[in-house]
Amino acid sequence: MHFIDEVKIYIKGGNGGNGCISFHREKFVDRGGPDGGDGGFGGSVIFRSNHHINTLVNYRYQQHFIAENGGNGKGSNRSGKSGKSLILDVPIGTQIFSEDGNILLHDFTEDEKSFEIIKGGCGGLGNSHFKTSVNQAPRKRTEGEIAQEMWIHLRLKLLSDVGLVGLPNAGKSTFLSVVTAAKPKIADYPFTTLVPNLGVVYINDEEFVIADIPGLIAGAHQGHGLGDKFLKHIERCNVLIHLIDGSSHNVIADYDTVRFELESYSDYLKNKIEIICINKCDVLTDEEIQKKIKKLQRVTNKVVHPISTYTNLGVNKIVKLALEIIKNQI
């Protein structure tokens, strides 16, 4: 399935049905009074969060959604049938924005929550409403209300507790596959991960969700590479696990590149708690590991953890640390 995280769609509520002009007809009743019924209400447009959906792909090819119109009123004071509301399911984490993209209309952060974005039009009045002492046979009725219409943007921000960040080929997908049951594509070349991958980590009856974001490169916040498109998916997370390729000749430059992109993208990412890990320590000597750790700690003033997703060195420690941070922030 394609991963689609942003779409623009047109939505419109159902128009109200028209009121009816009708007069009572009955044998031996010469002049029956007005009995025109009211028009039915138009259907509303309602968005609903659904945990079974994880992409907006259903809105990529169909972009126009219109609720059902209300039925017209009928004689014998019969009201028109109300139009059926249109319910549009979206993934948890979906945000609804105005057409210009500047106004947030709703943010779905929980499952099975509904948001009525457009109310259906009211039905028109039948002629029975317009009978007066001087007008016993009114030929007047009102038309149904025209419902609101609009273009909106749907933007999906995945809900995860932990975000995996790092340059391409830092070992993020392997880390995800080791600590969860997720099966991301893994290979020894950059940009193996083309879309975000989610996995659930289970530890002693506790769990959290971790997201593997496609690798960042210099200029990602300006649209270079793949990272810019997906950085939004880790804005909601509690903690970042920053993986650095231990076999790199310049771990400082690698770290700084990713940090600059995070800080340039938003203050949300800039201020996230960060767990720094030097990965692929299985290909380094103990002396090389310590040398690189000291370099990074001197620059970052943070603890740096040596790990290997190949041998599982230090991986469980990182997972437990992430869980502890998450629990402290709840």
Curated annotation (Swiss-Prot):
GO cellular component: cytoplasm
Main location: cytoplasm
Signal peptide: none
PROSITE patterns for this protein: G_OBG, OBG
Domain OBG-type G: 160-327
Pfam family, one: GTP1_OBG
UniProt KW keywords: Cytoplasm, GTP-binding, Hydrolase, Magnesium, Metal-binding, Nucleotide-binding
Binding site for Mg(2+): 173, 193
A molecular function GO annotation: GTPase activity
Enzyme Commission code: 3.6.5.-
Domain Obg as annotated: residue spans: 1-159
Quaternary structure and partners: Monomer.
Free-text function comment from the UniProt entry: An essential GTPase which binds GTP, GDP and possibly (p)ppGpp with moderate affinity, with high nucleotide exchange rates and a fairly low GTP hydrolysis rate. Plays a role in control of the cell cycle, stress response, ribosome biogenesis and in those bacteria that undergo differentiation, in morphogenesis control.
Family per record: Belongs to the TRAFAC class OBG-HflX-like GTPase superfamily. OBG GTPase family.
Protein name: GTPase Obg
Taxonomic lineage of the native organism: Bacteria, Pseudomonadati, Pseudomonadota, Alphaproteobacteria, Rickettsiales
Gene: obg
